[in-house]
């Protein structure tokens, strides 16, 4: 069941949160410990409006256990259908509630801000009878979150395993895959009641209504991933295609690569987008490389097929496709590539095959030289770009925070989606350059990824819808 958490804090706010959320969820949770003191009539109104909600009252730090118990006793006398009670409540008090009010369904909850042993917690909780056992954990990285999800799928039902904090979102989105008895999101206009708890509208945007125990997982890995809009755009397309799948951003550092790939092997991943700094760091975890990835020695797309992980790169072809759409030929053109990372490698390799004369500018000259050798180009220190004479097209592949000498040839492209518009492109446009935004490349390389992931479902109409969604979204940024 999907549950909207309502926490006011005022009576009027709580009532509005219920009314706005009720039609989107299966049940409402009233966090009465967070709602301002209610009189009997107000409490009755909220319970009636919420239609058999879960009543929850957590113990405040300054509240004595005796007062907490009395509060729970008074709520139990209302004979709610559900009560959520923390496992720290003295057993005698819990037994009193169960004996006096046998019709109340109990959710026994355990919350921790640490990384703990899920199986041990669950087995200990089984000693206390309950209708649902809810365990909320705090993973320290994406791998730990995925390992919790794997273990949660094996627990006897009904149970609920969720994660808090920066890395907790996958457990919320994948709750149907886990077969959680209950999943929680902050109700419409309601504050979040736990670190990392998603808002209801955010959770639903992950194609949540289509998800089940048989869902496929797609996502983005890298560090950072917060600049990407892919969780919005890609889930829009998945929803439009009515696929039983979702797309989630997973922050993964280079040091976490080994544990991450160990975790995903036993989960229904079907595809991953790869961003920096992992494009060249994951080769040992791929079973086979497509020519597109071999050519540039960089991976931006993983396809999971027949128990194998296949590596591709759509960055270069995405740029080539975009330039062709704009009737821009690169044959015999002098193109400055700024940067020598994974995306720069893919773009340079593809444009070299189309006859471009490539000039690689980078902070580390050895990296520029290595790339120049691969694409039969020339390498230069980043600072020398300022006085370089012959440029027809410049493509910036450096992160937004890295400064470099701005040049304004006839065509200027910045592959960064954010910030939008980039200060560099704004200045280039004022100088009369034709500018190409990062989101335009993002669109084309993403569509090539989709063609690898689910070719049987992609249509020209859905591709156009995706393009329009991204363009309209970026216009509002």
Curated annotation (Swiss-Prot):
Pathway given in the UniProt record: Metabolic intermediate biosynthesis; chorismate biosynthesis; chorismate from D-erythrose 4-phosphate and phosphoenolpyruvate: step 3/7; Metabolic intermediate biosynthesis; chorismate biosynthesis; chorismate from D-erythrose 4-phosphate and phosphoenolpyruvate: step 4/7
Active site: 111 (proton donor/acceptor), 134 (schiff-base intermediate with substrate), 279 (proton acceptor)
Keyword ATP-binding annotated: no
Binding site for 3-dehydroquinate: 21, 29-31, 56-58, 172, 197
Keywords: Amino-acid biosynthesis, Aromatic amino acid biosynthesis, Lyase, Multifunctional enzyme, NADP, Oxidoreductase, Schiff base
3-dehydroquinate dehydratase as annotated region, ranges: 1-209
Source organism superkingdom: Bacteria
Catalysed reactions, semicolon-separated: 3-dehydroquinate = 3-dehydroshikimate + H2O; shikimate + NADP(+) = 3-dehydroshikimate + NADPH + H(+)
One of the GO biological process terms: amino acid biosynthetic process
Region (Shikimate 5-dehydrogenase): 210-477
EC code(s) of this entry: 4.2.1.10, 1.1.1.25
UniProt xrefs under Gene3D superfamilies: Aldolase class I, Leucine Dehydrogenase, chain A, domain 1, NAD(P)-binding Rossmann-like Domain
Record-level Gene Ontology MF annotations: 3-dehydroquinate dehydratase activity; NADP binding; shikimate 3-dehydrogenase (NADP+) activity
Residues that hold NADP(+) according to the record: 339-343, 362-364, 438
Sequence positions that bind shikimate: 228-230, 300, 315, 445
Keyword Amino-acid biosynthesis appears in the UniProt entry: yes
A Pfam family annotated for this UniProt entry: Shikimate_dh_N
Family matches, as SUPFAM superfamilies: Aldolase, Aminoacid dehydrogenase-like, N-terminal domain, NAD(P)-binding Rossmann-fold domains
HAMAP family from the UniProt entry: AroD, Shikimate_DH_AroE
Family membership noted in the UniProt record: In the N-terminal section; belongs to the type-I 3-dehydroquinase family.
NCBIfam families in alphabetical order: aroE, PRK09310.1
Record's function text: Bifunctional enzyme that catalyzes two sequential steps of the aromatic amino acids biosynthetic pathway. In the first reaction, the AroD domain catalyzes the cis-dehydration of 3-dehydroquinate (DHQ) and introduces the first double bond of the aromatic ring to yield 3-dehydroshikimate; in the second reaction, the AroE domain catalyzes the reversible NADPH linked reduction of 3-dehydroshikimate (DHSA) to yield shikimate (SA).
Name the UniProt record assigns to this protein: Shikimate biosynthesis protein AroDE
Organism: Chlamydia pneumoniae
